[in-house]
UniProtKB/Swiss-Prot annotation:
Any one GO MF annotation of this record: chromatin-protein adaptor activity
Family, as annotated: Belongs to the Nibrin family.
Gene Ontology biological process: DNA double-strand break processing; double-strand break repair via homologous recombination; meiotic cell cycle; mitotic G2 DNA damage checkpoint signaling; protection from non-homologous end joining at telomere; protein localization to site of double-strand break; R-loop processing; telomere maintenance in response to DNA damage
Record-given protein name: Nibrin
Motif (FxF/Y motif): 804-813
Superkingdom per UniProt: Eukaryota
Biased composition (Acidic residues): 549-571
Source organism (scientific name): Danio rerio
Length: 818
């Protein structure tokens, strides 16, 4: 855009657009000079292009270019700065070329289209990035961006998009040009006060950074801010990674830009982190600091470099404070997290553990190449530990407390050295098959040296950590042979402990302390561990109540139990209700054992029939019983075993391979009679039927006394889950025959069958609606509640914004004319 600027004050400038011709004259022309009598009606013609302006003289008194008179009818090409005089009086102008280069910021696409049309109408152009050639910055509202900082430092006006619409209209209608101050946008920065910000052109901003060197640590940061630094008179310099120019860094005129302040999630290598720390140490040693990117904009807005972009000053504003540099490794490697169990209401499972505090003495055990990991102590306060020892545990105790217990896996193989010494001291019967047959009641040695050698962590059993919970799923008798080993130990030990307490609750009811159960560690050096088989927990104690005549074994078991009852107890005492229940069950089992012994004498002749088939099974079960618990069990497990079906007994007995080393003739005979009584009894005479009726009564009495309703250790409130396939199969319908029988000799008149209309036989079963409702809707209740609250908050915010927009929207309705 070219412009004829009058040399005398008070005159109006004339805009010359490219591609048009302008006639200078006194009447009926584009450029009127009415106050000069030496101006002809058609004095001269100006032809405007992008590069130059051509002048053709057609006047009477002449036209002068830089003081030289043009000949009449001649043509002269004019350049920027030429002085032109029309006539002989005071119609003097200077030719100037004004390039309108507009940069836009925060303008939407529709606004850019309109803005570009207005700028092209006055001979300008629209650019997307700021350069030194830009003359205007267009923003709807002022936000502190790199373009805003550059426009302030270059003293360029910041205007609204409406400014160029008014400029285009003024040029076309030859009206006075609009002023940029009237189209200045408002500030839209919450951290800046409108009264403190001056967006007008102030020349001191051009030299705001003069004499300062801005040292950049990354090339991206330098590319983004170097234009703003150069607009303020500063010098930009990139510091190579690893370089430490001490003299440059220690200078007070050097502004070291913080590399992390501009990035929300910087990715810094360890070498770069070490280099940044070295640069920071050099700065702190001289009392200097890093400069953040925001300080460049604040210095340009406030026209001051005393506080901002001054490494010697300290900032109190939170918005420009330097952020500490963290290594990326701390996100995943230097964070200590305690693995804790969730609260009971969220898991819907309540698990408790007993006090298993580790001894202060150092423990040592000989593993002979086999490693085992013990349990860690429970993290509780001393007061909580004392209360746990003195109070009985219940299923509802402390549902919200958090316990930290590290679960470990115990090897199925045993420690040979420990087992051999314990076998000699305790006198207990241990199986030589190379597997743990069951828990053996033992007393911890009183000697301190022996404890250090053979009792790591006081031989804590797995039952301390795998207590039966009321939320466990019931197991079928056929599936117990393949259950995991730790769970098998837990259930087996619990049953054995209950049986011992029931047997001796009458004679030793004054005892209030509970027993400490430890996992029997079997020695299996001569056998292969791959031949280990799991038995049912009820079969392990099958022969306990059928030996009333074995006086020697009974005395040995009584001495062993007295030895156990006097030991220290770490397990919490049982409740009074459980003791009373076990007392009653013990008396009942004693009576049942006497009745069952009388019945076995009557049916002894029938038991001889299946002697050969059950011989191997009874010997294996007898050996297993002698190895696990001895004769110190009640008749309750015997009645439970008698309720099993013949396939179960045969399946479990066949799993035990190899003969037993310890055999007693009397026990073997009794066991044969019992197995034949259960398996091979047939209604041959009245005596057998009577014994079966008595056995049914005994089974009912045993079930009523030790049923799942009265036994607190059995699981309750179980949930049965069934997986159904939601498919619909079309039922095959038989094709109805014709109404009339077909005779091949008759004439074929009408032989067709009408087809029923769909829906005639009833609507099909449609799976939908309530059939597809999820079973457990409370599983994601917290997530659904959070989503619902978020949706309500969003609707509330939208409603408030709508009310605010309606409040400030001004749409007056025109009044109706009457």
């Amino acid at each position: 855009m070219w412009k004829l600027q009058p040399t005398e004050s008070g005159g109006e400038s004339v805009i010359l657009l490219a591609g048009q011709e302008y006639v200078v004259g006194r009447k009926n022309c584009e450029i009127l000079l009415t106050n000069d009598q030496s101006i002809s009606r058609v004095h001269a013609v100006l032809t405007v292009t992008e590069q130059a302006v051509t002048l053709k003289d057609s006047s009477k008194y002449g036209t002068f270019v830089n003081g030289e008179k043009l000949e009449s009818g001649s043509t002269k090409t004019l350049q920027t700065g030429y002085k032109i005089t029309f006539g002989v009086f005071q119609s003097k102008f200077s030719l100037e070329k004004e390039c309108i280069v507009v940069c836009s910021s925060c303008v939407d696409n529709e606004g850019k289209v309109t803005l570009s049309q207005d700028i092209r109408s006055v001979g300008g152009r629209l650019v997307s990035s700021w350069t030194s050639d830009c003359t205007h910055l267009v923003m709807p509202t002022v936000k502190v961006t790199i373009k805003t900082i550059c426009a302030l430092l270059c003293c360029r006006p910041i205007v609204k998009p409406a400014f160029f619409s008014a400029l285009s209209k003024a040029v076309q209608q030859k009206l006075p040009l609009p002023k940029a101050e009237r189209f200045r946008p408002q500030i839209d920065e919450p951290s800046l006060a409108r009264d403190d910000v001056d967006l007008s052109a102030r020349p001191e901003r051009k030299s705001l950074f003069k004499g300062k060197t801005f040292l950049f640590l990354s090339s991206k940061q330098m590319k983004r801010l170097s234009v703003a630094v150069s607009c303020g008179g500063g010098v930009s310099q990139l510091l190579d990674e690893g370089a430490l120019p001490v003299s440059l860094l220690e200078s007070s005129s050097t502004c070291v830009l913080d590399m992390i302040s501009g990035n929300s999630q910087p990715v810094i290598s360890p070498a770069s982190k070490k280099w940044l720390d070295s640069v920071g140490q050099i700065l702190h040693r001289k009392g200097l600091r890093f400069i953040t990117e925001s300080e460049v904009g604040l210095a340009a807005i406030h026209v001051s470099n005393q506080t901002y972009c001054n490494p010697c000053s300290s900032l109190q504003s939170e918005s420009v404070k330097t952020n500490p540099v963290f290594a990326s490794a701390t996100l995943s490697q230097s964070t200590a997290v305690d693995e804790t169990a969730l609260a009971a209401p969220s898991q819907n499972i309540t698990a408790y553990v007993v006090n298993t505090e580790i001894s202060q003495d150092q423990s040592r055990m000989v593993t002979s190449g086999i490693s085992a990991v013990g349990e860690t102590p429970e993290k509780t306060n001393p007061t909580q530990k004392a209360s746990t020892t003195n109070k009985p545990l219940s299923l509802g105790q402390e549902p919200s407390s958090t316990r930290i217990v590290q679960e470990t896996v115990m090897s199925s193989e045993s420690f040979s050295v420990v087992e051999s010494e314990q076998k000699m001291k305790k006198g207990s019967v241990v199986s030589a098959r190379g597997r743990v047959e069951g828990p053996v009641k033992q007393k911890a040695p009183s000697s301190g040296n022996t404890t250090l050698k053979h009792s790591p962590q006081k031989q804590t059993a797995l039952t301390s950590f795998f207590q039966p919970s009321s939320k466990k799923r019931p197991r079928e008798s056929s599936a117990s042979s393949v259950q995991p080993e730790p769970k098998f130990f837990k259930k087996d030990i619990k049953d054995n402990e209950d049986d011992i307490q029931q047997s001796f609750s009458v004679n030793r009811s004054h005892k209030t302390s509970s027993e400490e159960t430890s996992l029997g560690q079997a020695c299996g050096t001569g056998q292969n561990s791959s031949s280990k088989k799991r038995k049912e927990p009820e079969q392990d104690t099958l022969l306990g109540a059928e030996e009333p005549t074995a006086a020697d074994d009974l005395e040995m078991s009584l001495e062993e139990l007295e030895f156990l009852m006097s030991d220290e107890m770490d397990e919490p005492p049982q409740t009074a209700a459980n003791k009373k229940q076990r007392l009653e069950s013990g008396l009942t089992s004693k009576i049942n054992s006497e009745q069952l012994s009388n019945q076995q004498e009557v049916t002894e002749s029938k038991g001889r029939k299946g002697e050969k088939n059950q011989q191997s099974s009874s010997s294996n079960i007898q050996s297993m019983q002698l190895d696990r618990a001895g004769p110190a069990v009640t008749n309750q497990d015997t009645q439970t075993q008698s309720k099993r079906s013949p396939p179960d007994l045969e399946a479990h007995s066949s799993a035990n391979k190899g003969p037993s080393k310890n055999k007693t003739p009397e026990l073997e005979e009794v066991k044969k009679e019992e197995v034949s009584f259960v398996v091979n009894s047939r209604p041959q005479n009245g005596i057998s039927q009577t014994s079966e009726a008595v056995l049914k009564q005994e089974m009912q009495a045993s079930t009523s006394n030790s049923g799942p309703k009265n036994d607190p250790d059995l699981p309750r409130k179980l949930l049965q889950v069934q997986f159904m396939s939601l498919t619909v199969n079309n039922s095959s319908r038989s094709r109805p025959g014709p109404l009339q029988t077909h005779n091949p000799n008759d004439k074929n008149v009408k032989r067709f069958r009408k087809k029923n209309v769909p829906g005639f036989d009833g609507l099909p079963k449609i799976i939908g609606g309530s059939d597809l409702v999820a079973h457990n809707r409370s599983k994601h209740s917290e997530l659904e509640e959070w989503l619902r609250q978020a949706a309500e908050e969003e609707k509330l915010n939208e409603r408030e914004e709508t009310l605010g927009d309606d409040l400030f929207r001004y749409n007056p309705r025109p009044a109706k004319k009457r």
